[in-house]
Structures are given as C-alpha cells and as structure tokens.
C-alpha cells in the first residue's frame, strides 16, 4: 500500500474481546481514519459459539463506528481455514446479512478456496495463515476498495 498512510492495529492471537478492550482504551483515539478494514474472529473459533463470534464482531463494528464515525468501515469475513470451512461459511453468511446496511462486507473466501469451498492449500502456509501468494491475492482485492 505504497503512498498511503496506513496503521496496522492487528495483533497475533487477538480475539474479538481483545480488540474491543483496545478500542475502549483509546486505540482509535487521536486520529481520523478515512477507511478502516476489519478482519477478526478466527481466533474465537475454538472458544466461542457461532452466535458469540457473530455478536463479538458486531460489537467491534459498533465500537469502531462510535469512535471513528467518519470512516468507511470494511469488514472482511473470517478467512477460511482447514477443516472448518463450512462453519466459517455459515458465520460469514450471517455476518454479511447483519452488516450489509451499515458496513461494506468483503468476502475473501472465494478467493482462497476451490469451487467446493475447501481452502486452496497453495495459498496457505499452514491451513490457517495465508502465505505470500495468498496475501498478495487479498491485497489486490483490498486495493480496489482503497481506489474507490
């Protein structure tokens, strides 16, 4: 994202509750963002129900909108991961429905899976994290939102 002022506020192992805590404690204070991209939820999969994950993501989006009301909020669906593709597809389907009125929903699953919805292992380093090629594909999509 050359020639752009970008802040990466993501942390490894974060769950929705960690992001909420940081937002409530000033993470989004002191600057005005034009656009915010949110990708959260995958680390909640082993600890929370689908409903709890959905509620957590929605709480994060509301907290962002309160603190950065001028920003265009783009929420990416949970990225597919090995052996949980169907569950993630269902959560993302519900997430898209809930967000389509207030946010831009970005579906990256089709980019990273085959026609059957199974992850394309050539785009992942470990079945969870995209590799360089996977991140390049994601970046191409995100650039289209930045350019519009």
Specify the residue positions occupied by each region the protein language model found.
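Conserved SGNH/GDSL esterase-like catalytic core that processes O-acyl groups on lipids
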Residues: 1-62, 66-68, 80-93
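Surface-exposed aromatic
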Residues: 40, 75-79, 121
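Residue-level signal for well-ordered alpha-helical segments
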Residues: 13, 34, 72, 112-115, ...
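A non-catalytic structural micro-motif
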Residues: 68-74
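Catalytic His-Asp segment of secreted/periplasmic serine-dependent ester chemistry enzymes
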Residues: 82-148
């Amino acid at each position: 994202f050359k020639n752009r002022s970008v802040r990466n506020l993501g942390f490894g192992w974060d769950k929705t509750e960690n992001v909420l805590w940081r937002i409530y404690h000033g993470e989004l204070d002191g600057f005005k963002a034009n656009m915010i991209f949110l990708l959260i939820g995958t680390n909640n999969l082993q600890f929370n129900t689908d409903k709890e994950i959905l509620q957590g993501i929605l709480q994060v989006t509301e907290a962002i909108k309160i603190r950065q009301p001028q920003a265009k909020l783009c929420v990416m669906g949970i990225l597919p991961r090995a052996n949980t593709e169907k569950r993630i597809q269902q959560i993302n389907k519900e997430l898209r429905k809930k967000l389509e009125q207030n946010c831009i929903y970005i579906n990256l699953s089709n980019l990273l899976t085959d026609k059957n919805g199974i992850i394309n292992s050539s785009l992942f380093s470990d079945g969870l994290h995209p590799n360089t090629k996977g991140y390049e594909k994601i970046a191409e999509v995100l650039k289209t939102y930045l350019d519009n």
